[in-house]
Amino acid sequence: SPCTCSTCNCAGACNSCSCTSCSH
């Protein structure tokens, strides 16, 4: 399953942009 983004490099687009901070 995908990680949950706590910080993304594109706001609101965690699924199509890279996470800068993730938790599983």
Curated annotation (Swiss-Prot):
Q: Which residues bind Cd(2+) 4?
A: C8, C19
Task: Provide the binding site for Cd(2+) 2.
Answer: C5, C22
Q: Which UniProt keywords apply?
A: Cadmium, Disulfide bond, Metal-binding, Metal-thiolate cluster
Where Cd(2+) 1 binds, per the record, is at C3, C22
* Conditions for induction: By cadmium.
**Is NADP a UniProt keyword of this protein?**
no
Q: What positions does the entry give for Cd(2+) 6 binding? A: C10, C17
Is-annotated flag, keyword Ribonucleoprotein?
Answer: no
Task: Tell me how the protein is altered or processed after translation.
Answer: Contains 4 disulfide bonds.
- Binding residue positions for Cd(2+) 3: C5, C19
Q: What is this protein called?
A: Metallothionein
Taxonomic source organism:
Neonectria lugdunensis (Aquatic fungus)
